[in-house]
């Protein structure tokens, strides 16, 4: 029997402030980004997960840093910063045979929750950024695939609050995330949307 879950690590106003400060940087400058993350008190991933707080946790996602809240952040100078804050997944003895998020510091999981709860967590973070930045430049929804990408174009970067397939599960599960994406990086990834491509090149 498949058990449905949604896990979340909240994005509060303080974290939004921190992310918007990072969005002012050149995300292709790995040294500057790393220095700002150290100033923010975001330890390196290996340092954090090697500490006592994670001693009894199962495998956690690989990243470059961990926020004080518990988010796993990837920012390695390629023009992006990726911060997942919610996961939608099943525990059925296949890919997962236990609820891995229940014991991860900063995260809570809800058994029996599914898309309405997952979408609500995403909408909450969208609203937090809307409160700071105003209405988004794009709000792209793909109902067939249950995805939504909301984006704001800033001077140097784009802020995206997105949801979609989670790559570490071979797209079996989904995540909701904040993505900072450089408008100048040559090899920065694009969402599968002409509107998103137009956003970045306009």
Regions inferred by a protein language model and the residue ranges of each:
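Short helix/turn-capping signatures at newly exposed starts of structured segments
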Residues: 1-147, 154, 159, 164-202
């Amino acid at each position: 029997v498949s058990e449905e879950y949604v896990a979340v690590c909240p994005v509060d106003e303080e974290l939004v402030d921190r992310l918007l400060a990072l969005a002012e940087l050149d995300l292709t400058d790995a040294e500057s980004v790393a220095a700002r993350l150290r100033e923010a008190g975001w330890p390196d991933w290996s340092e954090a997960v090697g500490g006592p707080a994670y001693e009894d946790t199962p495998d956690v996602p690989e990243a470059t840093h961990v926020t004080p809240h518990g988010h796993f952040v990837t920012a390695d100078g390629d023009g992006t910063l990726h911060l997942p804050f919610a996961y939608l997944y099943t525990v059925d003895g296949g890919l997962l045979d236990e609820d891995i998020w229940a014991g991860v510091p900063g995260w809570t999981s809800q058994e029996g929750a599914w898309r309405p709860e997952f979408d609500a967590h995403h909408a909450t973070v969208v609203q937090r950024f809307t409160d700071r930045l105003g209405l988004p430049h794009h709000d792209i929804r793909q109902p067939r695939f249950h995805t939504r990408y909301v984006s704001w174009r800033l001077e140097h970067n784009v802020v995206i609050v997105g949801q979609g397939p989670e790559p570490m599960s071979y797209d079996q599960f989904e995540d909701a995330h904040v993505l900072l994406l450089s408008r100048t990086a040559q090899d920065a990834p694009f969402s599968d949307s002409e509107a998103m491509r137009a956003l970045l090149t306009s």
